[in-house]
């Protein structure tokens, strides 16, 4: 009964939170600030958001209830109208369907062009007039909300009152008692994925605006974190290679069907049986025994850290629109991350009581049979799922002991504590690029601190000298050097235990080694600054090679690379490597080129780097007290080794292939990419100046708008990824990735085209765009939009840190005085960029 009534049980959670409340008295969370909503007299609802995430652009949506006749809906659209305004398809086309409603989505409408905004509003009401039922208009972006609301109201007067929508059939939860084991071919070479999905009753609409979805979401994410950590440790201890562990919770705000909780593991095809046994064992253990207090405390801390990070993250227009759509269709609450944090911080529940409720949540959800589906995606066309089902059930039944949990609160005591003499600050100044405070210490080390309101501190420790300085490095090993620093025992802790200790304290840490430098970077809670310094010092002074960790890393990396090659980034990495053949230091990983002696070679490099910490800089950005941070740094800086050695910028041979190359692969060949698609890469050597950089960014947007006209009749969604490279040569590149939209989301006279036709159209489009003229009006609009975007970047902590590191690493400034350089960009500058790309290296990569 507990499993069948899991959400009724969640009402009891809130009874514990608010003594004396009845189920019908669950408090409403209200709506996030910044959203203007209501209903016009004729019954049309509206949700309007002024959001500066994407300067100069806005997303619009129209929701029509009970408008699920796809033929009628598709017939109402004309792609020419939107394409001429620079508005392309979303991944679903212009139309998607959810909860018995049709949803029209128009993204990146250029609001800096009044004609585009006016035309979009007119079109929305043309669509409104074609459907008599209840409807809602959603808009999020660079908008004057008060003015937009007035315009929508005036337009609404031209439309008759809406007919009330009939009540939708009541949702019925249909639990299952027998597990389902499913197999499908995944088109890979050796990578298999095991997915374990538990279904659960959706939250009733009357509770969607209460804290109940927040608590379900919190427990789901805590469960996902615990399962990931347990599986990673168990696979590691059993030396079973693991590409990834992922967890996905599909909540009631994103579907009109059951909620689902899915655990996914990427493993070798040859290890499917053993992986099944291990996964079943972990699930059985957590079902029988729940989680320990220490493990639950760790999961709570990780969830809180994730919430803190998301509170500082900007909200995209797509995210705003999605949450408003879910509110209109499903009654979902629209709560900001900060409001959610406020709710969770107000939950005055003792740890043991909270853990007890969490364990009851686990017991209600996880079961060896009920509401369970296990899916296997493998390279083979057939699989004995009956045998795997028996393996799963046997492992569940025979799990002998609890899974070990290796995060201990006293692990931090093992970290290095600085005993060296305090290092005085020799001078203090202001960094001209970031306006941060520069502290120069007596040993030559420099720290730049920029005070912000972010509770999550961003940090980076950069030391000049990149992978060209690794002794005897072999061709292709450069891409792996940064990973080697994560394979050391630190202060007696294994690599995994050290990572767990950092994660338990909310600290992220990654090492990146480029052609120019080494950089250790990440985030940390503001109250963990001292622990962060001790962790960096521990890597610096007390590390030892762990050869077993490297061997396991190499076996896992082979699987991770196959997973990566099926992604958009993987496709672009392949096309990039085609344009730059025989480059000795590629950034793309090829595990066949990873030598077993790289850890020893990398250690010589790291040892040399850590002897010259003065040849670099530390950047810290966040809500820290400057005086308190100074005390930590004065105590810590003397423990870092410094010397007189300095690195010089390397000279490396680099050849960009000229001309046009075409590669065609069958999607069943299990090579690169997933599904059908057309991909195009363009690159050209071009000297970097700030004016050229601004011209390149305008050119990318102009190309996007022009390509929309060519891709719209072919039913293609596409994205453009611009790339700036400064070393070993100054180069610009763009990567265009096209994928077919579903027919149901396209206008009636459009069907998704074959990838070969898509590439042919792009091939013809380039000369046309290159020969076109950029009008003064268009340039002005594009320049104004970019000015707004760059103004937003100048206040974005992540972008500021990237710009700072780029200046200190490669000597180029992409932040200072941007408006001056942008104002100087001419139409000729923009067209020269496009022309150089058209004359440069071009690669077509077709998956059919």
Describe each region flagged by the PLM.
Residues 1-10:
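Bacterial N-terminal signal peptides that target proteins for export
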Residues 9-18:
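Bacterial N-terminal signal peptides
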Residues 22-50, 136, 142-209, 213, ...:
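Proteolytic maturation boundary segments
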Residues 49, 54-140, 190-211, 231-352, ...:
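M16 family metallopeptidases and their MPP-like homologs
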Residues 216, 220, 224, 431, ...:
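Long, His/Glu/Asp-enriched segments that create or flank divalent metal/ion-associated functional microenvironments
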Residues 594-598, 602:
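Alpha-helical scaffold elements lining the catalytic groove of polysaccharide deacetylases
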């Amino acid at each position: 009964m507990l499993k069948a009534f899991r959400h009724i049980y969640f009402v009891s959670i809130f009874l514990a939170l608010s003594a004396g409340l009845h189920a019908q008295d669950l408090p409403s969370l209200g709506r996030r600030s910044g959203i203007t909503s209501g209903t016009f007299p004729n019954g049309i609802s509206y949700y309007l958001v002024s959001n500066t995430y994407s300067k100069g652009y806005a997303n619009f949506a129209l929701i029509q209830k009970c408008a699920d006749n796809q033929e009628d809906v598709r017939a109402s659209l004309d792609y020419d109208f939107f394409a001429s305004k620079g508005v392309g398809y979303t991944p679903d086309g212009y139309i998607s369907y959810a909860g018995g409603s049709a949803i029209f989505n128009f993204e990146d409408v250029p609001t800096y062009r009044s004609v585009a905004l006016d035309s979009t509003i007119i079109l929305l009401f043309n669509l409104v007039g074609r459907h008599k039922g209840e409807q809602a208009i959603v808009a999020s972006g660079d908008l004057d909300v008060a003015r937009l609301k007035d315009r929508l109201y005036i337009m609404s007067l031209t439309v008759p009152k809406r007919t009330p929508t009939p009540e939708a059939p009541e949702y019925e939860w249909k639990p299952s008692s027998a597990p389902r084991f499913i197999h499908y071919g995944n088109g890979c070479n050796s990578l298999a994925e095991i997915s374990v999905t538990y279904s659960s009753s959706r939250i009733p609409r009357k509770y969607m605006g209460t804290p109940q979805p927040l608590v379900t979401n919190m427990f789901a994410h805590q469960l996902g974190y615990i399962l990931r950590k347990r599986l990673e440790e168990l696979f590691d201890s059993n030396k079973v290679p693991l590409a990834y562990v992922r967890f996905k919770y599909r909540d009631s705000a994103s579907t009109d069907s059951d909620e689902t909780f899915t655990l996914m593991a990427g493993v070798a095809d040859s290890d499917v049986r053993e992986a099944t046994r291990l996964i079943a064992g972990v699930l059985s253990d957590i079902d029988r025994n729940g989680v320990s207090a220490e493990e639950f405390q760790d999961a709570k801390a990780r969830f809180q850290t994730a919430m803190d990070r998301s509170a500082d993250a900007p909200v995209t227009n797509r995210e705003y629109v999605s949450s408003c759509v879910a509110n209109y269709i499903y009654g979902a609450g629209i709560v900001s991350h900060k409001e959610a944090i406020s709710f969770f911080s107000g939950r005055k529940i003792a740890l043991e009581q909270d853990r007890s409720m969490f364990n009851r949540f686990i017991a209600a959800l996880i079961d060896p049979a009920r509401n369970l589906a296990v899916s296997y995606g493998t390279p083979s066309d057939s699989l004995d799922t009956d045998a795997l089902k028996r393996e799963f059930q046997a492992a569940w039944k025979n799990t002998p002991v609890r899974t070990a949990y290796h995060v201990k609160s006293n692990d931090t005591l093992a970290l290095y504590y600085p005993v060296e003499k305090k290092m005085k600050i020799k001078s203090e100044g202001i960094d001209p690029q970031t306006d941060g405070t520069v502290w120069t210490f007596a040993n030559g080390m420099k720290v730049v601190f920029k005070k912000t309101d972010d509770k999550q501190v961003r940090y980076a420790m950069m030391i000049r000298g990149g992978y060209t300085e690794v002794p005897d490095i072999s061709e292709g090993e450069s891409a792996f050097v940064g990973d080697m620093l994560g394979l050391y025992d630190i202060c007696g802790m294994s690599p995994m235990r050290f990572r767990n200790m950092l994660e338990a304290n909310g600290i992220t840490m990654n090492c990146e080694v480029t052609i120019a430098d080494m950089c250790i970077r990440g985030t940390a809670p503001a109250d963990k600054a001292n622990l962060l310094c001790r962790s960096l010092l521990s890597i610096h002074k007390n590390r030892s090679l762990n050869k077993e960790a490297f061997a396991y890393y190499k076996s896992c990396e082979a699987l991770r690379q196959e997973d990566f090659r099926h992604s958009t980034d993987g496709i672009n990495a392949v096309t990039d490597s085609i344009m730059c053949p025989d480059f000795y230091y590629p950034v793309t990983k090829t595990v066949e080129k990873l030598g077993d002696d790289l850890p020893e070679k990398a250690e010589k490099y790291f040892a040399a780097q850590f002897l010259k910490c003065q040849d670099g800089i530390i950047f810290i950005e966040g809500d820290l007290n400057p005086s308190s941070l100074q005390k930590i740094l004065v105590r810590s800086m003397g423990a870092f080794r410094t010397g007189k050695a300095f690195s010089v910028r390397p000279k490396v041979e680099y050849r960009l292939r000229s001309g046009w190359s075409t590669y065609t692969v069958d999607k069943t060949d299990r090579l690169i990419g997933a599904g059908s698609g057309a991909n195009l890469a363009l690159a050209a050597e071009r000297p970097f100046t700030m004016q050229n950089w601004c011209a390149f960014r305008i050119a990318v947007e102009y190309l996007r708008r022009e390509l929309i006209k060519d891709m719209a009749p072919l039913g293609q969604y596409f994205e453009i990824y611009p790339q700036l490279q400064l070393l070993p040569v100054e180069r610009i590149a763009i990567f265009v990735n096209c994928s077919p939209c579903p027919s149901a989301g396209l206008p009636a006279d459009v069907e998704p085209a074959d990838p070969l036709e898509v590439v042919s159209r792009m091939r013809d489009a380039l000369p046309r765009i290159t020969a076109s003229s950029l009008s003064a009006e268009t340039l002005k609009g594009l320049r104004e939009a970019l000015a707004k975007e760059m103004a937003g970047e100048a206040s974005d902590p992540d972008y500021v840190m990237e710009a700072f590191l780029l200046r200190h690493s490669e000597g180029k400034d992409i932040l200072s005085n941007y408006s001056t350089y942008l104002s100087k960009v001419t139409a000729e500058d923009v067209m020269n960029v496009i022309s150089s790309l058209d004359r440069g290296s071009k690669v077509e990569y077709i998956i059919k």
